[in-house]
């Protein structure tokens, strides 16, 4: 997004949303191509990852103001825009497309030849985010090595990618995750200038299941203590099982599991997901650099 300077130190930005498919010949800054789907509906998601400390959830920028330009050039704002766009209409996207339907999920976790901890592994097994077929492949073992990236839920994109693992408390009440942390600019306290870093932002989240896609909680990069060698240690458990030394003062961060597990059928299930946002071009260990499942450990090395 290209920004223009307004009054004082305020930057203004304008994004044009078009009901068109992008083509390889189009490379226009500040254009978002959002073709309609069922019943001529379009869906736009405005995401803010982390505002600075003591700043409101918009990052101090307020919500963007929509302006609707009609075919005759007339521009509508405010309530008129909402009425014409019918912004209160029900979402036409099938929720089955956003997650796994409950009946299918129950079948996947109850396969007759699998243990009651399935598909959790001990030690945990990590998966990159591929297409929907490979999402189901976490349960069936059938992952297409040539599947495309940046699909399969949780809104990945060119700048934001995940790796994930499914856990089960029947393997143990506490999981310790240790790895090397990508460097990030320390801006949470309001620092305006940023130093060079591996990624813009990274986080580790715990989720319930791919049925309800509910997030339990997340840790972002500046919340996680890093040792002198650049490594983090994170304990993951229910509140009741939290180790006494899982506090920042002891160099161990803590991430909670939900008390009701996957929120559906198994109280012991949790999904954890690492996110890398906007990696530097020269950072060779980012999630974005992993194109195939079998490359994961080789590419990420100590960072996973």
Where on the chain are the PLM-derived regions?
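A compositional/structural signature for long, glycine/proline-rich flexible linkers
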Residues: 4-304
């Amino acid at each position: 997004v290209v920004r223009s300077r307004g009054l004082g130190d305020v930057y203004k930005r304008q994004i044009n949303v078009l009901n068109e498919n992008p083509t390889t010949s189009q490379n226009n800054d500040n254009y978002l191509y959002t073709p309609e789907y069922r019943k001529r509906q379009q869906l736009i998601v405005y995401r803010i990852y982390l505002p600075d400390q003591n700043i409101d959830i918009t990052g101090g920028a307020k919500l963007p103001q929509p302006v609707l330009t009609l075919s005759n050039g007339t521009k509508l704002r405010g309530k008129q825009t909402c009425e014409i766009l019918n912004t209160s209409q029900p979402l036409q996207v099938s929720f089955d497309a956003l997650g796994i339907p409950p009946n299918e999920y129950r079948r996947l976790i109850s396969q007759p030849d699998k243990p009651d901890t399935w598909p959790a592994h001990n030690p945990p097994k990590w998966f990159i985010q591929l297409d929907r077929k490979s999402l189901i492949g976490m349960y069936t073992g059938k992952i297409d090595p040539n599947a495309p990236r940046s699909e399969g839920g949780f809104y990945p994109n060119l700048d934001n990618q995940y790796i994930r693992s499914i856990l089960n408390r029947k393997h143990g009440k506490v999981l310790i995750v240790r790895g090397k942390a990508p460097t990030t600019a320390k801006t949470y306290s309001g620092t305006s200038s940023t130093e060079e870093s591996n990624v813009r932002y990274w986080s580790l989240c715990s989720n319930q299941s791919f049925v309800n896609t509910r997030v339990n909680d997340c840790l972002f990069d500046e919340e996680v203590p890093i040792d002198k060698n650049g490594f983090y240690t994170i304990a993951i458990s229910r509140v009741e099982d939290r180790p006494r030394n899982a506090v920042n003062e002891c160099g161990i961060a803590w991430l909670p599991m939900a008390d009701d597990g996957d929120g559906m059928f198994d109280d012991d299930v949790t999904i954890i997901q690492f996110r890398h946002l906007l990696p530097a071009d020269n950072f060779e260990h980012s999630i974005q650099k992993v194109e195939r499942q079998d490359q994961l450990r080789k590419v990420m090395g100590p960072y996973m």
